[in-house]
UniProtKB/Swiss-Prot annotation:
<dbReference type="InterPro" id="IPR006304">
    <property type="entry name" value="T3SS_SpaR/YscT"/>
</dbReference>
<keyword id="KW-1003">Cell membrane</keyword>
<keyword id="KW-0812">Transmembrane</keyword>
<feature type="transmembrane region" description="Helical">
    <location>
        <begin position="12"/>
        <end position="32"/>
    </location>
</feature>
<protein>
    <recommendedName>
        <fullName>Surface presentation of antigens protein SpaR</fullName>
    </recommendedName>
</protein>
<comment type="similarity">
    <text>Belongs to the FliR/MopE/SpaR family.</text>
</comment>
<feature type="transmembrane region" description="Helical">
    <location>
        <begin position="82"/>
        <end position="102"/>
    </location>
</feature>
<dbReference type="InterPro" id="IPR002010">
    <property type="entry name" value="T3SS_IM_R"/>
</dbReference>
<keyword id="KW-1133">Transmembrane helix</keyword>
<keyword id="KW-0472">Membrane</keyword>
<feature type="transmembrane region" description="Helical">
    <location>
        <begin position="182"/>
        <end position="202"/>
    </location>
</feature>
<comment type="function">
    <text>Involved in a secretory pathway responsible for the surface presentation of determinants needed for the entry of Salmonella species into mammalian cells.</text>
</comment>
<feature type="transmembrane region" description="Helical">
    <location>
        <begin position="127"/>
        <end position="147"/>
    </location>
</feature>
<dbReference type="Pfam" id="PF01311">
    <property type="entry name" value="Bac_export_1"/>
</dbReference>
<keyword id="KW-0843">Virulence</keyword>
<feature type="transmembrane region" description="Helical">
    <location>
        <begin position="211"/>
        <end position="231"/>
    </location>
</feature>
<dbReference type="GO" id="GO:0005886">
    <property type="term" value="C:plasma membrane"/>
</dbReference>
Length: 263
């Protein structure tokens, strides 16, 4: 009896490990579930509970935890989890990059440019827009979307069968993040560029004025003013537009000759 229970526990642990490998990257990437919000043992327990909740098989169907057959399955599940984490984190990375661009242009991250080793890692505007995107995402059913994507991924890529996530398209992910962030930041960047031109002309007529010192204050005020006008009507809709839905997941599993573009 005790020997049977011992082997049964091994199967349960194997199912939890496979589920953890797919769900954990999503928790690591999403800003409202990462280590800044959940940390340590509580987060691991929640990951396992979520993984077992969406697990598509009986808990005793997984191979034994210490068997060689577990190695390729864990690697496959981890690859699928990284892909899902990147797709679900897409709007948050765009908003984070948007905040970094704005803060860089207004001079808030000047210390990082002068001394990268001791400068700040993340600007305040980037953190704010990242959390703002998380609020918009959660308010519009983001957790339901996350669970739908997980369920759909198990339908398309069964953990007990061989499947290959299409990881090469993720290599263009940084380009697409930068592209969307630059498009969203362009109104603010354009106004800040014009303000620098006017300050440069003013310094020509008033050489005794320190245009650089004044520009930091002026550009910060202008950036905040433009964001007040630009924030509400544009950014929430773009967070929802960039949010990944379960209906688009089928194209992210490997097919020869297929192309993948995030819009």
């Amino acid at each position: 009896m005790f020997y049977a229970l011992y082997f049964e526990i091994h199967h349960l642990v194997a199912s939890a490990a496979l589920g953890f490998a797919r769900v954990a990257p999503i928790f690591f990437f999403l800003p409202f579930l990462n280590s800044g919000v959940l940390s340590g043992a509580p987060r691991n327990a929640i990951i396992i509970l979520v993984a077992l909740g969406v697990w598509p098989h009986a808990l005793n169907e997984a191979p034994p935890f210490l068997s060689v057959a577990m190695i390729p399955l864990v690697l496959q599940e981890a690859a699928v989890g990284v892909m899902l984490g990147c797709l679900l984190s897409w709007p948050f990375w765009v908003m984070h990059a948007l905040g970094c661009i704005i803060d860089n242009q207004r001079g808030a991250t000047l210390s990082s440019s002068i001394d990268p080793a001791n400068g700040i890692d993340t600007s305040e505007m980037a953190n704010f827009l990242n959390m703002f995107a998380a609020v918009v995402y959660l308010q519009n059913g983001g957790l339901v979307t996350m669970v739908d994507v997980l369920n759909k991924s198990y339908q398309l890529c069964d953990p007990m069968n061989e499947c290959t996530p299409s990881l090469p398209p993720l290599l263009t992910f940084i380009n697409q993040v930068a592209q969307n962030a630059l498009v969203l930041a362009s109104p603010v960047v354009l106004v800040l560029l014009l303000s620098e031109v006017f300050l440069g002309l003013l310094s020509r007529f008033a050489p005794q004025m320190n245009a650089f010192a004044i520009s930091l204050t002026v550009k910060s005020g202008i950036a905040v003013l433009i964001m007040l006008l630009y924030f509400s009507p544009v950014l929430p809709d773009n967070v929802l537009r960039l949010s990944f839905q379960a209906t688009g997941l089928s194209s992210w599993f490997y097919e020869r000759g297929a192309t993948h573009v995030l819009e």
